[in-house]
């Protein structure tokens, strides 16, 4: 199978020798390549068992930022790998399954979001961390669900704000802060 076929599938589907001890082989490569394996809470137990650290997307990004490993293997979705690369531009970041997507990030096409932002030049743009690097590139502040309220409240009450792409989180922050942020058209379909 050539590289293009692998990329099309998103992962390697070649049969693995049943006599191979995968954990031992992964540990060997981890040491040999100076790699850090990060696993999201949503991963299977087998993936979590071999990960150096298991956590949510924010915790994984924080681990990536402080590692001295040469390679970061992000067992999560695309935006998590992109976030690790933003924080660690000199490191090689690998996402084992190229089909691993996030419905929220996928529901916010960067070109459409950038157009929306351009149509509102007097607005501050706040984006939820679960979004692509391309959306983050047109964002002023990136927030998590834990700090979104605090960040929004740090702006003057009359500040015009676009909040995206999680409409549910944006609407909740509007309701508890009394703000009237422009909440983008996207939302989390299934998580």
Where are these regions (language model features)?
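Conserved small/polar residues in nucleotide/adenosyl-binding loops
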Residues: 186-191
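Carbohydrate-active enzymes and regulators
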Residues: 91
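Metallocofactor- and cofactor-centric catalytic cores in central/energy metabolism, strongly enriched
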Residues: 2-83, 87, 96-111, 115-126, ...
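Internal active-site segments that recognize and position negatively charged phosphoryl groups
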Residues: 151-155, 159-175
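Donor nucleotide-activated moiety binding/catalytic core segment of transferases
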Residues: 143, 147-149
């Amino acid at each position: 199978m050539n590289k293009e076929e692998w990329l099309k599938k998103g992962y390697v589907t070649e049969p693995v020798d049943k006599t191979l001890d995968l954990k031992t082989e992964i540990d060997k490569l981890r040491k040999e390549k100076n790699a850090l394996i990060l696993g999201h809470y949503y991963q299977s137990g087998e993936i979590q068992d071999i990960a150096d650290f298991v956590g949510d997307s924010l915790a994984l990004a924080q681990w990536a930022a402080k590692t001295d490993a040469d390679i970061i293997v992000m067992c999560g979705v695309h935006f998590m790998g992109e976030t690790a690369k933003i924080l660690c531009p000199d490191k090689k970041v690998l996402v084992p399954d190229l089909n691993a997507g996030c419905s929220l990030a996928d529901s916010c096409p960067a070109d459409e979001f950038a157009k929306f932002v351009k149509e509102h030049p007097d607005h501050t743009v706040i984006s939820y961390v679960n979004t692509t690097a391309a959306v983050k590139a047109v964002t002023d502040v990136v927030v998590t669900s834990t700090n979104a309220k605090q960040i929004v409240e740090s702006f003057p009450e009359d500040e015009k704000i676009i909040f995206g792409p999680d409409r549910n989180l944006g609407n909740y922050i509007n309701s508890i802060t009394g703000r009237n942020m422009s909440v983008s058209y996207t939302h989390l379909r299934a998580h």
